Every structure is written in C-alpha cells, then in structure tokens.
C-alpha cells in the first residue's frame, strides 16, 4: 500500500515539474529575461506546493533544469527550448496566470488548460500586417532623420520585402543567421536600385534605414539585464546570439554594396554627406514619432 501511495506521489510530482518547466519554456521562448523566468517559475512552484528550500532551478538559453530534493530523495527534470522569438503578450499572460492560480487555487488541470491556451494562442495580427507595420516603422525612422516622404515609402517597401523574405527563409528551415543575411542583402539591393529612380531628394536614406528591423534590440536588452543580474552564462549566450545576428545583417549589407556599387560611385562619401537633421515642421514630426513607435511595438510583439 505504501509503495502504491509513493508511486502516486512520484507521478504527481513529475506532473508538477512538467508544468513548471513548460511555464519556463514559454517564457524563455518568448524572450523573457532570466530574472523574470526565475521569478515566475518560483511563483508557480509556490502554487504547486513545492517548498522553495527544496527547489533548485537552472536556466540556460536552450535548456531548463529543475530539481526537487530532500535528505532522502531527489527528482530532476529537463526541458529543451528550441524556438526563440518575441512575444510580450505571452510573457504578460503567464505572469498574470501565476498570480491568478494562487489567488483562485486552480487545480492542476485548470492551470494546464490555461497554459495551453497561452501556448496555442494566435497572434492578434497576421504576418503581413506585422510586415507592413515593420515597414512603416523603418520608414518613420528614415523620415525622422532627414528623409522625405518618398524615401519613407521606399524604405517601407524594402523593409516589407526583406521582412517577409526572412520569415519565408525561416519557414523553409534555413539557418536563422543566414536568413538575416539574405533579407539584409535583398533590402539593400532594392534600396540601392531605388536610389537611381530620381523619385526622392534623399535617395540614400533608405539604404541606412531599410534594415533597422533586423537590429536585435530585445536580445541586446536581455543580455545587459542578465549580466547585471549575475546570470552570466545566459547573458553571454544572448550576447553571442546578438553578435551573430548583427554579423549576419552586416554581411548581407556589405555583400550587396560590394556586388552592386559601381566604381564611379563612392558610396562612403555619399553616406558622409547625408544630413540627419529633420527638415519638416514640428507638427509633422509630432506624427512621425508616434507612427514609428506604434509600428515598432507591433513588430516587436508588444501588441501581438
């Protein structure tokens, strides 16, 4: 009888650890910082009735490890983290779920059901809407720093094409960093081709702004945050990931310019001559900034 009871307790503990790890996995794959992941996992462990003094959590970029041990027993479980993206809504909902589970004393089935809803929830915006907003965000940045409205439109078009190209490459199973390089190459080629159209009085501003969507702002912030919070291993891994993303972007841009720029065009001098001072009235810039910020937030996942 005791053996049966012990076996049931072990199965229950394994289920609790599984729910705990699935919670941490969702947070890690949604680009939460390590401190937030640890804080939420400990809160969920408290809801699950796991004593904090017996709980040991190890968080890595690609692996989560949880151990519950006392003087006689030790149970460990691992969870692989494979797909890293940005989903701020998922992070927010998991945090609210952990508090709600404690306050309303959720059953394990209820908590698992709510967790699955968060994991399977579709984004509020379709991929093409996100791509359009990303284009407007980069176009708004171009407009804020001296570009005209035609340059804004050119930047938006180039960014849209590059954003969808990167998404398609990832869907086809191409390496993430190679996908970034391909999209940066295509963006730069399009922007350079538009510079000969004569449509814009600031033809080289789109070259500088069309690949801004690739800049890994969230990974960079998480890297700094993790290093400050003394999560050194995860922080260094995030830093390496950030460097690889920037390297892929730089390679794509440099390769495009090396391949396309004609010998009689000194592109470095063209860039050094660019004016970054806005030439619009203040009321125009008053609309530029919210447009840039709103579209940037959509493409980064704040409202997704």
Predicted feature locations:
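Soluble N-terminal domains of membrane-associated systems
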Residues: 1-109
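Alpha-helical transmembrane segments and their membrane-interface boundaries
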Residues: 85-304
């Amino acid at each position: 009888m005791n053996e049966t009871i012990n076996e049931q307790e072990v199965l229950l503990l394994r289920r609790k650890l599984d729910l705990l790890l699935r919670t941490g996995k969702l947070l890690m794959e949604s680009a939460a910082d390590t401190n937030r992941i640890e804080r939420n996992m400990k809160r969920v462990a408290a809801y699950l009735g796991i004593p904090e003094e017996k709980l040991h959590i190890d968080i890595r970029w690609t692996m989560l490890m949880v151990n519950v041990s006392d003087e006689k027993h030790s149970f460990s479980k691992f969870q692989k983290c494979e797909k890293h993206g940005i989903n701020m809504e998922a992070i927010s909902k998991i945090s609210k779920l952990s508090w709600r589970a404690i306050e309303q004393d959720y059953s394990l089935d209820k908590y698992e059901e709510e967790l699955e809803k968060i994991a399977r929830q579709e984004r509020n915006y379709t991929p093409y809407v996100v791509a359009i907003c990303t284009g407007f965000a980069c176009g708004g940045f171009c407009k804020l720093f001296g570009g005209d409205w035609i340059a804004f439109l050119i930047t938006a078009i180039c960014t849209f094409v590059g954003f969808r190209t990167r998404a398609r490459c990832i869907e086809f199973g191409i390496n993430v960093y190679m996908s970034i390089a391909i999209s940066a190459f295509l963006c730069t080629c399009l922007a350079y081709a538009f510079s000969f159209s004569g449509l814009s009085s600031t033809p080289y501003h789109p070259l500088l702004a069309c690949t801004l969507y690739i800049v890994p702002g969230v990974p960079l912030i998480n890297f700094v945050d993790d290093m400050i919070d003394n999560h050194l291993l995860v922080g260094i891994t995030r830093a390496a990931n950030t460097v690889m993303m920037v390297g892929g972007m730089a390679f794509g841009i440099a390769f495009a310019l090396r391949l396309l720029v004609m010998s009689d065009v000194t592109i470095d001098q063209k860039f050094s001559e660019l004016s970054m001072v806005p030439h619009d009235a203040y009321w125009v810039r008053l609309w530029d900034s919210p447009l840039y910020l709103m579209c940037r937030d959509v493409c980064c996942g704040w409202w997704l």
